[in-house]
Amino acid sequence: MNPLAQPIIYPTIFTGTLITALSSHWFFAWLGLEMNMLAFIPVLTKKTSPRSTEAAIKYFLTQATASMILLMAILYNNMLSGQWTTTNTTNPYSSLMIVTALAMKLGMAPFHFWVPEVTQGVPLTSGLLLLTWQKLAPISIMYQMSSSVDTNILLTLSILSILVGGWGGLNQTQLRKILAYSSITHMGWMMAVLPYNPDITILNLIIYIILTTTAFLILDLNSSVTILMLTRTWNKLTWLMPLIPSTLLSLGGLPPLTGFLPKWAIIEEFAKNGNLITPTIMAIITLLNLYFYVRLIYATSITLLPMSNNAKMKWQFENTKPTPLLPTLTILTTLLLPISPLILSIS
């Protein structure tokens, strides 16, 4: 990507997300999504290669299809009700089409196929933006129309996303694909609680962004994209070794780490509404995610693979990239659970 284009592209992405998040008019919400999508495509092709070009095309085709479905649903809803406000979506068919379009944009199952492939084909920084920032605009629309969404449809999509996210990540060796499937699982948890308490969805989104950003910063600092490359962290960046297990376990939702907080809040919210079967199923399926994270920790931090003498610990370490955010994010990734009563009272 041309460096001269960056001062235009990144503000456009930010502006598009902001327009969608702050708009209560369907046309401006759709316009913000389009600005965001078109400006994000050059970010995916930041490092020109056939793989990144393929990823950008897949992203564009999926997002364009979702945008067409969304626009058709908006026009259909306006034809029936005469309203353009995002909170007034009472027709079940238009609501179903809107949820389908936004699920495609979020990468929820069964519209998830593009997420692992696009994440795998782009650099780590672009993958981080894809799995974090690009979720904000669609979730903001879902938040505004949470009272008019069919609960059964959302729960079906959520359980399916959690299942696909856990099942799909089991046989992966590429770290970007593992984080992509983890993102699908987290989207399932967020959307499951949306009809009951949208504020917990926002809390889950914030914690998810913190955890995913920490994981991507560690991988970028270590220049690791596969499990094998991550196993060599001990002889390059020894000080990074304690951070890897804590971050991965928190992503898997293991107590008493921060990643358990949103799951705890969601299960509690379901229990308040008299629904115990759904969170039980979701929690059991999420063990698949925890399993492949524990397996990843076992390969990187507990076992030491046979290596030649050239791979022994270096007497002089390489200069590392400056990471001013990593210490703060690591603390937030591991130590937020003790103050969870305060966080839940605010939300």
UniProtKB/Swiss-Prot annotation:
GO molecular function ontology, one term from the record: NADH dehydrogenase (ubiquinone) activity
Membrane topology listed for this record: Multi-pass membrane protein
E.C. no: 7.1.1.2
Keywords from the UniProt entry: Electron transport, Membrane, Mitochondrion, Mitochondrion inner membrane, NAD, Respiratory chain, Translocase, Transmembrane, Transmembrane helix, Transport, Ubiquinone
Residue ranges of the TM segments: 13-33, 55-75, 96-116, 122-142, 151-171, 178-198, 199-219, 237-257, 274-294, 326-346
Domain of life: Eukaryota
Principal subcellular localisation of the protein: mitochondrion
Localization of this protein: Mitochondrion inner membrane
GO biological process: mitochondrial electron transport, NADH to ubiquinone; mitochondrial respiratory chain complex I assembly; reactive oxygen species metabolic process
Keyword flag Transport: yes
Pfam families found in the cross-reference section: NADH_dehy_S2_C (PF06444), Proton_antipo_M (PF00361)
Annotated catalysed reactions: a ubiquinone + NADH + 5 H(+)(in) = a ubiquinol + NAD(+) + 4 H(+)(out)
Role this protein plays: Core subunit of the mitochondrial membrane respiratory chain NADH dehydrogenase (Complex I) which catalyzes electron transfer from NADH through the respiratory chain, using ubiquinone as an electron acceptor. Essential for the catalytic activity and assembly of complex I.
Subunit structure: Core subunit of respiratory chain NADH dehydrogenase (Complex I) which is composed of 45 different subunits. Interacts with TMEM242.
Family (UniProt): Belongs to the complex I subunit 2 family.
Name of this chain's protein: NADH-ubiquinone oxidoreductase chain 2
Organism for this UniProt entry: Pongo abelii
